[in-house]
Amino acid sequence: MEDQKQTPSNQTATPAGDEATSTAAASPETGAPDTAAAAVDDVAAQLAALEAKASEHYDLYMRAVAEGENIRRRAQEDVAKAHKFAIENFADNLLPVMDSLQAALADGSGDIAKLREGVELTARQLAAAFERGKIVELNPVGEKFDPHRHQAISMVPADQEPNTVVTVLQRGYTIADRVLRPALVTVAAPK
């Protein structure tokens, strides 16, 4: 009993010889440093591979971010160009109208029939330009009054149903279902 150390009651006493055996088992043997070095080298190689993979993914991420910025910038430039040159096509369609008006002003013959024919031709050119520009004329005679599309100037006694358009004083126009100018109209008064 003298060989045993005093231990608390929940632990068992270990002989002195057994401690030496367990310490020897825990200490590395002569081949153990090579194994530990190999494990460290293996972990270092794995770490290097993972760092390379992370660097590659970061590079791909940065390229994707740059590409997204380029796409956004190009889209903004395209929108700016569209706004800047949207009227160009319509203006190109109006040039023949201007040419016809200038030719009419330059004509000094005084022939009213010829002048009327030129004005009618110019009006057809303008109507064609409006059609290509998707501008539609409003002719609301007989329609119910719509304050979004019509502007009532007065109410007049008429045989028509109350609140319907009787006459158009100035034509209105829409472009792609959006009112450019409401039609100036007179409306049938209630009876």
Swiss-Prot record:
Assembly notes: Homodimer.
Region (Disordered): 1-35
Species per Swiss-Prot/TrEMBL record: Cupriavidus taiwanensis (strain DSM 17343 / BCRC 17206 / CCUG 44338 / CIP 107171 / LMG 19424 / R1) (Ralstonia taiwanensis (strain LMG 19424))
Biased composition (Polar residues): 1-14
Protein keywords: Chaperone, Cytoplasm, Stress response
Cellular localisation: Cytoplasm
A GO cellular component entry from the record: cytosol
Compositional bias annotation for Low complexity: 19-35
Primary role: Participates actively in the response to hyperosmotic and heat shock by preventing the aggregation of stress-denatured proteins, in association with DnaK and GrpE. It is the nucleotide exchange factor for DnaK and may function as a thermosensor. Unfolded proteins bind initially to DnaJ; upon interaction with the DnaJ-bound protein, DnaK hydrolyzes its bound ATP, resulting in the formation of a stable complex. GrpE releases ADP from DnaK; ATP binding to DnaK triggers the release of the substrate protein, thus completing the reaction cycle.
Protein origin, superkingdom: Bacteria
Family: Belongs to the GrpE family.
The protein, known as: Protein GrpE
GO molecular function: adenyl-nucleotide exchange factor activity; protein homodimerization activity; protein-folding chaperone binding; unfolded protein binding
Pfam families reported in the protein's UniProt record: GrpE
UniProt keyword annotation of Cytoplasm present: yes
Record GO biological process: protein folding
